[in-house]
């Protein structure tokens, strides 16, 4: 869904200039996304396009979900005193741009040109990824890595927070494969694994963002 303002000529010129400079850095499947959707407007569900808009400062600040999520995290965790790992940071590190330099970014498909000012790991995250250097693991729509973040963080006694996407990665034995069932499954996994020493919560974006998917957080009990 398009939720941003109608693009001005200046906005379109910025996008065209971006495409001329950086289009070749994107993999084929994301080039197709840019071809089809770059000029449609800011959305409630397309990170590739939204990250470009934020990078170019043509996003509507009051519906920028990355900034909302950052402020949400600030209200729950003492971010200044934490080493943070962001999983699935995407092609352009928009969420990370709101943090101080205490954040490391991980994404197998990140575009290194946009990450030169950050510590980053161009690799996938799984349940066995070494997170010993971090206090908090976060992800904004990390898709397939979502369950691994929860399991890995709880196993290693780390705080975690994930803004969930609308995909579904339920184990194959589940027949009702919807985003809602996936979110319920993740919450159940988190509460079962963290029952002894975690406060697990599920929250939602404000209505103006038109994002139905929840945010799941796990904070260690002190």
Predicted regions and their residues:
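Alpha-helix C-terminal capping segments
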Residues: 73, 77, 96-99, 115, ...
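SAM cofactor-binding core of SAM-dependent methyltransferases
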Residues: 86-125
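Amphipathic coiled-coil/heptad-repeat helices and related helical stalk/stem segments
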Residues: 66-69, 89, 145-146
């Amino acid at each position: 869904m398009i939720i941003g303002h109608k693009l001005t000529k200046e906005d379109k010129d910025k996008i065209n200039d971006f495409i001329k400079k950086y289009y070749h850095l994107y993999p084929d499947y994301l080039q197709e996304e840019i071809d089809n959707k770059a000029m449609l407007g800011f959305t409630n569900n397309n990170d590739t396009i939204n990250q470009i808009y934020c990078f170019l400062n043509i996003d509507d600040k009051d519906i920028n979900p990355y900034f909302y999520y950052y402020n949400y995290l600030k209200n729950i965790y003492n971010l200044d005193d934490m080493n943070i790992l962001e999983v699935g940071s995407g092609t352009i590190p928009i969420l990370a741009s709101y943090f101080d330099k205490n954040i490391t970014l991980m994404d197998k498909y990140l575009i290194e040109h946009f990450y030169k000012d950050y510590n980053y790991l161009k690799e996938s995250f799984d349940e066995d990824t070494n997170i010993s250097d971090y206090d908090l693991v976060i992800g904004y729509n990390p898709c397939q890595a979502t369950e691994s973040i929860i399991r890995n963080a709880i196993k290693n006694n780390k705080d975690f927070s994930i803004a969930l996407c609308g995909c579904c990665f339920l184990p194959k034995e589940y027949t009702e494969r919807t985003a809602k069932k996936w979110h319920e499954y993740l919450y159940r996994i988190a509460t079962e694994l963290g029952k002894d020493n975690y406060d697990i919560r599920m929250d939602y974006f404000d209505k103006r963002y038109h994002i139905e998917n929840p945010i799941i957080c796990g904070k260690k009990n002190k």
